[in-house]
Each structure stands twice: as C-alpha cells, then as structure tokens.
C-alpha cells in the first residue's frame, strides 16, 4: 500500500510533510510530490516530531503549495548505470538533459551507498600513467587516488581534463565520468560541445547540477556521478571521475545545513563538514576489481588555504596539480607548475630509484633557475659563473621539454598530440640532466613528445 503524506510547510527548497506516525519515511528516502503537471522529487533529511519529516527538494519548488500529496517511494534516489550512460548528459536524478532522445537503462543504483570494506580494497600503491610528461615525472597520480586540480580561469584546466579523458580512453581502454557541481551552465555547455568535437564524449558520462539549481541538487550531484563510476569499477574498469568543483559540494551542504536549522560551525560552514566530505571521498577508491581515480578541481575562497572547505579537502588528496598563469605567459602548455605540484607517489619505493632521482634533480635545477632569475634580470646572463650558465641552459630546456602537444587541442594548434610513456619521460629528462643535449637549441624542446622528437626537430632546424 502506498504511503502518502501532506505538505504542511514550504520554505524555499525545504519542505515539511506530515505522514501517519506509524509510517514515517526513512531518512534519505526519495519523495514524489505531485505538483499537477510535474512531479517534484525531494529527499528526507530530518524527522521532526512524531509525524512530520523535513525534506530538501532536488528540483525547483515553484508551483508547490500546502496540502499537496507526497508519496514515499520507499527507497533513496536511484540513478541509471551501465554502458548506456556513456555519451549522455544527466541531472542529479539521472534524467537526460541533453535533448538526445529517450533514455532506457536496464540497471540503476541508489546514490547513497557504503564505501568498499577493507577486504575489498586494493592496498598496493600503483602509478596511474597519464602520458603527460610533467605529471608523470614530477607529481604522478595514484591508481584509485584523489588529485586536486588548482588553477584560475583560463589557464587550461578544461583542456587538461579532456586530455586525461582522451588518454585513459585510448591508451587504457578506460572510461570517464564528469560531474559538474555548482559551476556555470555556460562552461558545462562549452565542455559538452568541445568533448563532442574532440571525440571523447563516447567514452564519458556527464552529470551536471549547476549553480542555478537548488542546493539539494548541488549537494547530491557528486554522489550521482560517483554512483555511475562505482558501477564501472565493479565491472573491472579503471574509471576517471572528474568533480568540478569540489568546493561547491561543501558550499551546497552549508546552504542545506542552515536551511535545516543546524547551528553553524567555523566560518559559517555546516557542523557536519568533515563527515559529509569523508562520506563522498571514502567511496572513491580502488578495489580488487577496478579503480576510481578522481581529479577534483578545487576553488580556494579568497586564496585562503586555511579556509575549512579547502582544508578539509586537502586531508583526502594524494596529489596536487597546480596550473600557473606565469607559465601560460611563457607560452608553455600544459601550464603545470613543476615546483608547486606534489604527489605522495613521488617515493623511490613506489616509482623506483631512477625515476625518483631524475624528478628530484629536475626540481632542484628549476629551483636554482628561479633563484638566478633576479640576478639575470639585473645584471644579465653574462655575469653568471660558467656552472650557473650551464644550470640556466639546462633549466630552460627542461622547462620547454615539460610542454607537450595535446591530442584534444590538435584542431587549434595544428600539432599532432603525443602520449609519452613514463619510461620515455624519465629517459628524456635524464639525458638532459647528464648534458647529452647541451648543444641543441632550447626552441627544439618546445611542444615535443619524446627526446627523439626533439632530435628530429633539431635536425630540421639545421636544414
């Protein structure tokens, strides 16, 4: 028998509904409120009193009024999973919003699920090869790890994300799920069409809950994307999960918390901040079947890294990739800052002695070059010692060799994209450090793949 309640109060996205005291819906159950020509889905958040629940709407509450009937579905919000979701664009409820026709999925998963148990998890640290030199060499990603992507507007976050999607699809046969959490609809729209043009859409599922949507949708959309990823992982796939932006997940939680009447914590955030973040992040992990590797764009409010939202996120990250405007000004792409980016995987026991030594030497030489830049600016390069001149020469070559042509940017750059295996990356930088290529002009190193490509370019320049 259906369990019906009546709407008794509506305050923005918060709805109070009265049920029979014997049949109160469980927490996190989905409710359907019949608003005439449409059904509004809400999620139970609190039990208040003997016979009343407080729910948060996942959709706009326009048109709702007191006295309307609400049906308890008896389960939490469930979203479609499986191969059918690839190439499509969904909202928080798993409904397609791309206008590409009807969607039928054989299977669906609830968005609230437990994290894998300790027995199921894979504990062996394993490198996730991206084929992008600067990442693989200096701040390698962990399979099943969580990576924070930091960068302002227009420094290439989206292109880097697209290249990662392209590389995992073509080189590893893996799939990607992109989750837009509380970001601009225009950016989501641009991303969708750019993915379509660059040919990576067929290997990707997109889930959007943008900044014009109610806080309930923005708070739960990350779970929708994660649930789709978990299905692929359980089928033995390596999945890339992109969350743009993880700060908006916290921000939406803060709005909901205030609306539910909870006493705020530090800086006005929800008292359950660490718990909510943990519940999401703990589900992102490798199991013995497959892995979910997550790349999360992190907005830092007022550039304050001690703000509770980014500070809570940092506790979960295994690696950080920092994109820098000063590097884009040099015309070097991807504009990853080699000295600011870091990774827990940069450990000789995981990546091996050779890779570790080369990475540390590259960082040292770039650090020394940064120190010398002030002297060069004031006195000129001729005033440096012979040893420092050598350091500057090699550092400039390394800086340019850290650039790379991307497959997804081919139509804009006219250069064929390059995927570089880690072994080739390490070998190339080792040879530069050893001085084997001191006689090659630094311009030959810009936008090349392997060191062989550099040598070919140098030969062409001589001709």
Curated annotation (Swiss-Prot):
Matches recorded under InterPro entries: AAA+_ATPase, ATP-synt_VA_C, ATP_synth_F1_bsu, ATPase_a/bsu_AS, ATPase_alpha/beta_chains, ATPase_F1/V1/A1_a/bsu_N, ATPase_F1/V1/A1_a/bsu_N_sf, ATPase_F1/V1/A1_a/bsu_nucl-bd
Highest taxon listed in the record's lineage: Bacteria
Keyword tags: ATP synthesis, ATP-binding, Cell membrane, CF(1), Hydrogen ion transport, Ion transport, Membrane, Nucleotide-binding, Translocase, Transport
Subunit annotation: F-type ATPases have 2 components, CF(1) - the catalytic core - and CF(0) - the membrane proton channel. CF(1) has five subunits: alpha(3), beta(3), gamma(1), delta(1), epsilon(1). CF(0) has three main subunits: a(1), b(2) and c(9-12). The alpha and beta chains form an alternating ring which encloses part of the gamma chain. CF(1) is attached to CF(0) by a central stalk formed by the gamma and epsilon chains, while a peripheral stalk is formed by the delta and b chains.
EC number: 7.1.2.2
Compartments, as annotated in UniProt: Cell membrane
Biological function: Produces ATP from ADP in the presence of a proton gradient across the membrane. The catalytic sites are hosted primarily by the beta subunits.
Family as reported in the entry's similarity comment: Belongs to the ATPase alpha/beta chains family.
Lipid bilayer topology: Peripheral membrane protein
Reactions mediated catalytically: ATP + H2O + 4 H(+)(in) = ADP + phosphate + 5 H(+)(out)
Gene Ontology MF: a single term: proton-transporting ATP synthase activity, rotational mechanism
Protein name from the UniProt record: ATP synthase subunit beta
Species, as recorded: Clostridium botulinum (strain Loch Maree / Type A3)
